[in-house]
């Protein structure tokens, strides 16, 4: 699994490319793309020694969502969509060796950084809903971790080779839940509720 990024503090949201820090933007791309390619360059010779190997490229957003939605920064948009294409390209190269590659995205992740941004911790994360009501669809890191575990244990995982997957979608595929027993489907929620300017209500989406 390749999850390297660390470029969050370099993002300048809603700033056009000609005003965005070029140094920061290019650094973001190196963190998002170069690190994944370098990891694959050295790790895949080991992976292909046995059939059934799997590469999971972690990103933000499904291919479907990112194809229709600008991610509010040219550099961030490019960084996250490139990882999806990277998984697709690796899938082509790995298939002859009986191995697979997928791109996987969590939903609205309650990472430590996200919780810090809202001034909450995991036990009281719902307090953040007073600031951002749509945070109701968020999920723990364990949720996408369970998605990875089920993918890795699936003897038929090759059927997903080259695809863009999400924690919410795989929860339905493999019938796992987040820690609270729910199945957040963040990307469907973002399209149908948040982006549609509907009132925040996660009913039917988790």
List where the protein language model places each region:
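Conserved catalytic Lys-bearing alpha helix of Rossmann-like short-chain dehydrogenase/reductases
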Residues: 33-36, 78-87, 101, 144
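Active-site/pore-lining binding-face segments in mid-to-C-terminal subdomains
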Residues: 101, 105-109, 114-116, 146-150
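C-terminal helical subdomain
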Residues: 103, 123-206
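Active-site Tyr-X3-Lys motif and surrounding loop/helix of classical short-chain dehydrogenase/reductase
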Residues: 12-31
